[in-house]
Design a protein with these regions (language model features):
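Short acidic (Asp/Glu) and glycine-rich catalytic loops that position anionic groups and cofactors
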Residues: 88-91, 264-266, 294-301
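Short glycine/threonine-rich loop-to-helix capping motif typified by GTGT followed
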Residues: 236-242, 270-272, 345-351
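Short, hinge-like loop/turn segments at secondary-structure boundaries
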Residues: 177-179, 203-204, 243-245, 272-276
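Conserved C-terminal portion of the radical SAM core fold
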Residues: 208-268, 283-292, 322-327
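Flexible, acidic/Gly-rich N-terminal and inter-domain linker regions that tether
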Residues: 1-66, 335, 352
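Conserved Radical SAM active-site core
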Residues: 35-71, 75-186, 190-198, 206-219
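C-terminal accessory regions of radical SAM enzymes
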Residues: 274-352
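Short, electropositive alpha-helical surface patch
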Residues: 141, 175-189, 236-253, 314-318
């Protein structure tokens, strides 16, 4: 590993910002050629938006609304599609994405205000549509828990996707929501290979811990599924059967998947990560990612961008659906209950 490797960070570089005419670089003064090797510390800024619920306009996602209590994500996943969104805030999609974070402390109040408005029509709202709502700073900020308290108070359906074990903290609220089919949880598992996980998703829970969480949630009646995403050919595609089997054995009710795409600055960030960590696989992995998307690692075409196309994509999908049929037959996630929503909020809560 190179001497300037920043431990615990997925990105190892700062990418330029497409919205900025200036690009800052480090100048080594006094003729020294020493590289900056100290890992940048995480900084949290408070953001105060006017609204918090975002309509989802992408037709291939299957969601109506999303809510993100945080912008940026300390998990630092090298492949994360959300990195590019950090440029809208004047930051880099690289190291800034995982070190310059924004928290929205007003989110619970704004959620309550929006779902109580006269024109709100109840529909499931997904937490973590962009960045993980249980990333490490949630332990300090607690915004996600307060959001769940609002969902529970008004019996409003909510979906969650995460790769962090902190969700275990909120089992009390999730169990309450599950009693009326008001919650669905998706645990994201990309690899059971701990070495790969540590390199690719440096500040996430281990795969074994995520499987434990699936089991704990399932045992208390909280519907949970596994999200095997993204599939990266040449890195984790061969793990599909094992991941689905392990998740099913611990009580997961369903499974989903997407294939990787490297839009915007992701190509630069991920290829740099791949060269540093798996140089012997670089050509194969990048070539196969391009094969999934018509010859380019980038893909913005709805439908194809998350599924891929061609022979390789068909092989991946066949392996996934064969495994899903084998391990998840006669299992389904419950449909969201849209009838329990109470604008009066006269539901008794006692979560401590």
């Amino acid at each position: 590993m190179e001497k300037d490797h920043w431990k615990g960070r997925g990105a190892q570089l700062q990418t330029g910002n497409r919205f900025s005419s200036q690009h800052l670089v480090t100048e080594h003064s006094e003729g020294l050629d020493e590289e900056l090797i100290l890992s940048p510390k995480t900084k949290i800024r408070l953001e105060h938006p006017k609204t918090i619920i975002n309509p989802v306009k992408s037709p291939d996602i299957g969601l109506s609304f999303s809510l993100n209590p945080y912008q940026g994500c300390e998990h630092g996943c090298s492949y994360c599609y959300a990195r590019n969104s950090h440029e809208y805030y004047g930051f880099s999609a690289g190291l800034d994405f995982e070190t310059q974070l924004m928290a929205k402390p007003d989110a619970p109040r704004l959620l309550e205000k929006q779902i109580l408005s006269s024109n709100w029509k109840v529909a499931p709202i997904s937490l973590s549509g962009n960045t993980d709502c249980y990333q490490p700073i949630e332990k300090k900020m607690g915004i996600t828990r307060h959001l769940l308290e609002v969902f529970a108070r008004y019996r409003h359906p909510v979906g969650i996707i995460t790769k962090n074990s902190l969700i275990e903290r909120d089992i009390d609220i999730l169990q309450d929501l599950a009693k009326e089919d008001l919650v669905q949880v998706y645990m994201s598992i990309t690899s059971l290979n701990e070495e790969l996980r540590r390199k690719m998703e440096p500040r996430t829970a281990s795969a074994s811990k995520r499987l434990q969480i699936i089991e704990k949630l399932s045992n208390v009646g909280i519907p949970v599924a596994v999200m095997n995403a993204p599939i990266i050919p040449g890195l984790n595609d061969q793990e599909i059967p094992e991941i689905l089997k392990a998740s099913a054995e611990r009580g997961a009710r369903s499974a989903g998947m997407t294939v990787v795409r490297l839009n915007g600055k992701l190509e630069e960030i991920f290829s740099d990560w791949l060269k540093r960590n798996y140089p012997d696989r670089f050509q194969k992995v990048m070539g196969q990612i391009a094969e999934l998307h018509g010859g380019s690692v980038k893909d913005v075409e709805f439908g194809r961008r998350m599924k891929g196309e061609g022979i390789l994509a068909e092989m991946i999908h066949q392996l996934f659906y064969t495994s899903k049929k084998k391990y998840f037959s006669n299992r389904t996630m419950p449909k969201f209950n849209l009838q329990a929503f109470r604008k009066g909020g006269n539901y008794s809560l006692n979560f401590g």
